[in-house]
Amino acid sequence: YTVMDNTVLTAVPLFLFMGYLVERAGIVSRLFFAIRLASHRLPASMAVAALVTCALFSTATGIIGAVVTLMGLLAWPAMIRAGYDKKFASGVICSGGCLGILIPPSIMLIVYSVIAQLSPLRLFAAAIFPGLLLAGLYIMYAVTLAYFNPSIAPKPPKEDIPPRSEILKEVMVSFLPLFSLIILVLSLIHISEPTRLS
């Protein structure tokens, strides 16, 4: 029971609270639709947007449940309305949600560091590259699958795509708040403990 006395565990509810604030502020939904517009030329552009949003939102919440639940409510209905295959859309949401356990600040890594008596900072540093690599592989798989089988992820109609200037403006405005948070968390991760960081 002495494991629960570890002060590192204080970071868990605080990182969860940070994820809740990001979600309630509407940053994630705006980011998803901005990335969808920016990637409209790619096959499975909505799937790409969902996976990128999952990876970015993982840096604010650190758990699977929050990412899967939010993206399931946000991206899944949008993909189904756009004519995406249900199995493909479900796979994208579930795989993207799993990135939360790898990309810092991962709650799982914090708990594991306490149990295994390892440095949480070293675990965070070790998990960044695999997490981003996994996100990239998911995106490549979704794009390749949709390229060879366009029926599972139809391209959006051209009339639904706004001018390039509007897309650029929307991407900049939606990226700025979350990107600032990501830079802050990842830059301080090497010089501070997770408890202080949270």
Predicted regions and their residues:
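Alpha-helical transmembrane segments of multi-pass membrane transport proteins
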Residues: 1-192, 196-198
